[in-house]
């Protein structure tokens, strides 16, 4: 591609028996990514997965991809919020105005948010959850998602 570099990592995917990525795959991806980031001066926030760009069509690399680990190794971003604090927010429902805030945060992060149907909003939220809250992917905006998105949106100023 003219504006991106793609790294393919072998996996059966969600349709054919989605597998955990091997340590070798992840260490190789980290090594190659760090090389490319340095060589092409890529910002951490611009390290993305297929589903970040095409949430309506793609699920990869998916919830088993260790984005948090990659971030600790200098590849991509992570929210750095204590997971125990976050889990307490998971069951808290949000108001309609907070749903609009969530969509605005997702837009700041770089997700495409124009003309979202209800179905595409669910797909968008699932994509966000696969990357930044892989423990629960339900497509529902809750307080936990809102807090994570708000924190991440501050990294995109």
Please place each PLM-identified region on the residue numbering.
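Short, solvent-exposed loop/turn segments at the edges of secondary structure
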Residues: 2-4, 65
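Cell-envelope/ECM-targeting effectors and their regulatory/trafficking segments
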Residues: 23-41, 55-157
């Amino acid at each position: 591609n003219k504006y991106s570099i793609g790294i393919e990592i072998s996996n059966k995917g969600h349709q054919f028996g989605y597998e955990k990525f091997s340590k070798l795959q992840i260490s190789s991806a980290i090594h190659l990514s760090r090389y490319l980031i340095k060589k092409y001066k890529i910002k951490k926030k611009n390290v993305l997965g297929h589903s970040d760009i095409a949430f309506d069509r793609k699920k990869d690399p998916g919830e088993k991809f260790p984005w948090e680990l990659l971030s600790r190794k200098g590849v991509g971003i992570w929210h750095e919020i204590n997971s125990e604090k976050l889990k307490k927010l998971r069951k808290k429902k949000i108001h309609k105005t907070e749903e609009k805030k969530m969509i605005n945060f997702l837009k700041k992060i770089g997700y495409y948010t124009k003309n979202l149907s209800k179905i595409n909003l669910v797909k968008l939220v699932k994509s966000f959850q696969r990357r930044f809250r892989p423990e629960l992917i339900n497509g529902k905006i809750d307080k936990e998602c809102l807090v994570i998105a708000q924190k991440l949106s501050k990294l995109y100023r």
